[in-house]
């Protein structure tokens, strides 16, 4: 009987100590994160953002982000996040941005997103001109668009992930059945080319703005050589997490299997 009491008492003490330590650790992390968020706030200044990113050893040419539609923000919140991310990319001289929103709310209105971005950029750029093109990669109207822009924004959703691979597999199988192509012509290079053309080019860096580290159905083919960054504390769309992701990419070693 006394052994049982001692066991439960020891277990309670261990759990209490661990709980207190975990709470203290999280409090320190939260405090430091919000302090850094204040110190590294961009203040809608292109010069401040360029000062931050200028010292990086290397920067990604193509960034992908995962954002979520929250009840408080709705569609307007998603569009605002897209505008902020686009402005940060322009100020950081990053020319390609992919925005993944699982349910596809943004993807349904690329023209509205592009118009909102153009309205938002003057807060950062002042009177300087900047060309932005927002695309829905699955739309047939996007195939021949001019790439000579300051920023190209791709809007994708869950249907562009595994479903795109399944559709491509079915299409190639159908072509083989109809003798249009032979099975020997179905190579890794062909699949890679088709997926990049039908969805998006492979990003260099993926930033997950969500509470949990989940890919949420993001196109898996595009993540083979991609660096992934997630901040479990500051997980909403914010500049500090964006900048920390750039620092993470700058310090990463690309061994490519060696």
From Swiss-Prot:
Subunit composition and interactions: Forms an active dehydrodolichyl diphosphate synthase complex with SPAC4D7.04c.
GO BP terms, alphabetized: dolichol biosynthetic process; protein glycosylation
Disulfide links within the chain: none
Predominant localisation class: endoplasmic reticulum
Similarity field: Belongs to the UPP synthase family.
One GO cellular component, as annotated: endoplasmic reticulum
Transmembrane segments: 5-21
Domain of life: Eukaryota
Keywords tagged on the record: Endoplasmic reticulum, Magnesium, Membrane, Transferase, Transmembrane, Transmembrane helix
A molecular function GO annotation: ditrans,polycis-polyprenyl diphosphate synthase [(2E,6E)-farnesyl diphosphate specific] activity
Record function comment: With SPAC4D7.04c, forms the dehydrodolichyl diphosphate synthase (DDS) complex, an essential component of the dolichol monophosphate (Dol-P) biosynthetic machinery. Adds multiple copies of isopentenyl pyrophosphate (IPP) to farnesyl pyrophosphate (FPP) to produce dehydrodolichyl diphosphate (Dedol-PP), a precursor of dolichol which is utilized as a sugar carrier in protein glycosylation in the endoplasmic reticulum (ER).
Protein name: Dehydrodolichyl diphosphate synthase complex subunit nus1
Membrane topology value: Single-pass membrane protein
Pathway stated in the Swiss-Prot or TrEMBL entry: Protein modification; protein glycosylation
């Amino acid at each position: 009987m006394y052994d049982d009491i001692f066991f439960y008492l020891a277990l309670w003490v261990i759990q209490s100590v661990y709980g207190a330590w975990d709470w203290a650790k999280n409090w320190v992390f939260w405090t430091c994160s919000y302090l850094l968020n204040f110190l590294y706030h961009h203040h809608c200044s292109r010069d401040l953002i360029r000062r931050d990113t200028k010292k990086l050893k290397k920067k990604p040419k193509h960034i992908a982000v995962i954002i979520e539609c929250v009840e408080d923000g709705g569609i307007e919140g998603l569009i605002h996040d897209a505008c902020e991310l686009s402005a940060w990319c322009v100020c950081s001289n990053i020319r390609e941005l992919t925005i993944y929103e699982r349910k596809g709310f943004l993807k349904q209105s690329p023209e509205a997103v592009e118009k909102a971005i153009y309205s938002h950029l003057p807060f950062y750029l002042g009177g300087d001109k900047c060309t932005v093109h927002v695309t829905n990669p699955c739309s047939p109207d996007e195939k021949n668009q001019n790439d000579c822009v300051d920023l190209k924004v791709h809007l994708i959703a869950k249907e562009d992930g595994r479903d795109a691979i399944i559709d491509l597999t079915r299409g190639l199988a159908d072509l083989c059945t109809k003798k249009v192509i032979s099975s020997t012509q179905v190579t890794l290079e062909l699949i890679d080319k088709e997926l990049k053309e039908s969805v998006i080019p492979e990003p260099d860096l993926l930033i997950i703005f969500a509470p949990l580290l989940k890919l949420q159905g993001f196109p898996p083919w595009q993540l083979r050589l991609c660096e992934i960054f997630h901040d479990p504390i500051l997980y909403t769309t914010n500049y500090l997490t964006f900048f920390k992701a750039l620092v993470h990419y700058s310090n990463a070693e690309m061994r490519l299997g060696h």
